[in-house]
């Protein structure tokens, strides 16, 4: 549960419909990924990769690009529960992340290099296979 401690501390589950933080380790042949458009105080996109029972998460202020040459700032945020990949809805105003969350893309991903080392170094290498986004 320690992986989701920050996630749970920031939310009042009596007020938000977001899924409560619980790790969900599964024997998956394919690792899920999701991009959610988050119309919060600042419009941005959330990029999430399934890993070790949670969704590793980054905020992308300018949103994804279809051009592989484009660089995008990705700000690491707290891990989210696996069930968050299906979350769409409105987080109440005044709550952490208040605003509307909409699914923008989903699919699966494959690591190209060691994920734990990449997280430590701040550079993950992977390929995604989504409905909108595809590539390395």
Q: Where in the sequence are the language-model features?
A:
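A charge-rich, low-complexity, intrinsically flexible signal that marks solvent-exposed coils, linkers
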Residues: 1-136
């Amino acid at each position: 549960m320690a992986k989701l401690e920050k996630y749970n501390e920031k939310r009042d589950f009596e007020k938000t419909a977001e899924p409560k933080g619980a790790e969900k380790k599964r024997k998956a042949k394919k690792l899920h990924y999701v991009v959610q458009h988050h119309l919060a105080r600042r419009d941005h996109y959330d990029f999430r990769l399934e890993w070790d029972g949670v969704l590793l998460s980054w905020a992308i202020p300018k949103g994804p690009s279809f051009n592989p040459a484009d660089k995008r700032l990705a700000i690491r945020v707290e891990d989210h529960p696996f069930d968050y990949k299906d979350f769409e809805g409105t987080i109440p105003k005044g709550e952490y992340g208040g605003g509307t969350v909409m699914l923008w893309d989903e699919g699966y991903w494959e690591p190209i290099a060691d994920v734990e080392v990449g997280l430590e170094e701040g550079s993950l290498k992977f390929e995604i296979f989504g409905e909108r986004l595809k590539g390395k």
